[in-house]
Structure formats: structure tokens, C-alpha cells
């Protein structure tokens, strides 16, 4: 049986340490390290495995700013003025955006409204990991949203999500929420520091390599901070 690789991860900044220590060497906080199992010692990370699966595109090519054709990257306007302004006048293809807020603040409803509208012209996928498809459909009906073209998926396995995304090739994806997603490559529970970090990295790489815009819904703690490692915010 393969030996499990373990590490101590700071709950505040997400920095890995080879052994436990009272103070995080990166952010300086005390008593924030938690032990996690990362899977077999020779197992690749989810992000590394993603690139091995043959997703088109590369993140390692070198170019100059003058060689980048901005005409091929038009922003996608949502029609919601304040939201577009926050994003710099629209959604950028290939971007990964984290939407955080208190429970009931309207994160899921806002993104559902945006995807229903944009799905009339652009292929869009809404992935729900917390609510059932019926619950999402009821909310859309209550808001009288156009749902005839929006793709829906109830799934929390990040590998299955990206496999289906490759099959249907949506240009917009909502992940609701990142805290309930998990990767089969990581031997820890959904919502743990390692799971959130790896799933986010996996999806960001997918967004960059396929030019797909992805929105993550993120929960917040009682203190008003985003739940999970600090690296999720960056």
C-alpha cells in the first residue's frame, strides 16, 4: 500500500510546512497549522494531472504584449451596470472570478440571472453542488428567467465537471460553491484547505487553457472573511 504524504497547512494563508510548528513561517500567525493528507507520496496534484489529460492550450509559451491580439478577447457585457463595472466593463474570457458574501446575500441568484440571460447568445453551464436542480429551477421560475438554453449540472467531483465541460464546451461556468467541490486526487474531505486550494487551481488552469470564464461562489466565515485558505482570494 502506498504511503500517504502529509503536510501541515496554514489555515490563514495556505502555506505548506513539512512539519508542525507554532508559527506560520509565511504569514506569521500562531497556532494556525493543520495536518492534512495529500494522498499517496507519488501521486500528482489535481492541477498537474489536469494538464496531463490533454486540455488544449499552454500556459508556458513566451510572447510580447504587442503580439497579443486584443480583438480576439472581447469582454462579455452582462447588462448589469454595477456588476460590469466591477469586472472592468464586462466578463473577460479565460478569467476566474470569486464571488463571496454572507449566506442569503444573493450570490447564487445574481449569477443565475446573469447566466440565464447570457445563455441566450453564449453557451453557459451552471454547476450546483449544494442545491438540487429542482431548487435552482424553482428560483429561476420565480424570477421569470429565460432557462431554455442554460446548461445545468448537479455535481461536486471536479474531475467529472471538467470532463463534461470539455464535452459541451461552455464559455461561461458558475461553480456553486467552491467549498463543496472535491478532487479524487486529494485524500481529504471537501471543504478542507487542500481540497479548496487544489480544486480552485484545477479550475483556474482549465479557465486559462480553454479561454472559459469561471465564477466561483465562496462562503464567508462569521468574521466576514472568505472561508478556506487565503490563497483562494488571490
Spans of features found by a protein language model:
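Short cysteine-rich clusters marking metal-coordination/redox-active sites
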Residues: 10-13, 24-27
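The Walker A/P-loop phosphate-binding site
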Residues: 51-143, 162
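Flexible beta-alpha connector loops of hexameric P-loop NTPases
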Residues: 72-73, 148-155, 183-197, 224
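Nucleotide-state-sensitive switch-loop elements of NTP-binding domains
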Residues: 116-186
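Short metal-coordination and nucleic-acid-contact micro-motifs, chiefly zinc-binding Cys/His arrays
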Residues: 4-6, 20-23
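Phosphate-binding/switch region of NTP-binding enzymes
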Residues: 204-234
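Catalytic, metal-anchored helix/loop core of enzyme active sites in primary metabolism
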Residues: 44, 161, 195-199, 205-215
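Short Cys/His-rich micro-motifs in 6-15 aa windows
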Residues: 28-38
Amino acid at each position: 500500500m502506498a504511503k500517504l504524504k502529509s503536510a501541515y497547512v496554514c489555515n490563514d494563508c495556505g502555506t505548506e510546512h513539512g512539519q508542525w510548528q507554532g508559527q506560520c513561517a509565511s504569514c506569521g500567525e500562531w497556532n494556525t497549522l493543520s495536518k492534512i493528507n495529500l494522498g499517496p507520496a507519488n501521486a500528482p496534484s489535481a492541477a498537474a494531472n489536469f494538464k496531463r489529460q490533454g486540455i488544449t492550450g499552454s500556459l508556458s509559451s513566451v510572447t510580447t504584449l504587442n503580439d497579443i491580439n486584443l480583438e480576439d478577447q472581447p469582454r462579455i457585457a452582462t447588462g448589469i451596470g454595477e456588476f460590469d463595472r466591477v469586472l472592468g466593463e464586462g466578463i473577460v474570457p479565460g478569467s476566474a472570478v470569486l464571488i463571496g458574501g454572507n449566506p442569503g446575500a444573493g450570490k447564487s441568484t445574481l449569477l443565475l440571472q446573469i447566466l440565464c440571460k447570457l445563455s441566450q447568445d453564449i453557451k453557459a453551464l451552471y454547476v450546483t453542488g449544494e442545491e438540487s436542480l429542482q431548487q435552482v429551477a424553482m428560483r429561476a421560475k420565480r424570477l421569470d428567467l429565460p432557462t431554455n438554453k442554460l446548461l445545468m449540472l448537479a455535481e461536486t467531483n471536479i474531475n467529472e465537471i471538467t470532463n463534461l465541460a470539455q464535452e459541451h464546451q461552455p464559455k461561461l461556468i458558475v461553480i456553486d460553491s467552491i467549498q463543496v467541490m472535491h478532487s479524487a486526487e486529494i485524500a481529504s474531505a471537501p471543504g478542507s484547505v487542500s481540497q479548496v486550494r487544489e480544486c480552485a487551481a484545477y479550475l483556474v488552469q482549465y479557465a486559462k487553457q480553454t479561454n472559459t470564464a469561471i465564477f466561483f461562489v465562496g462562503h464567508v466565515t462569521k468574521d466576514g472573511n472568505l472561508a478556506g485558505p487565503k490563497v483562494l482570494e488571490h
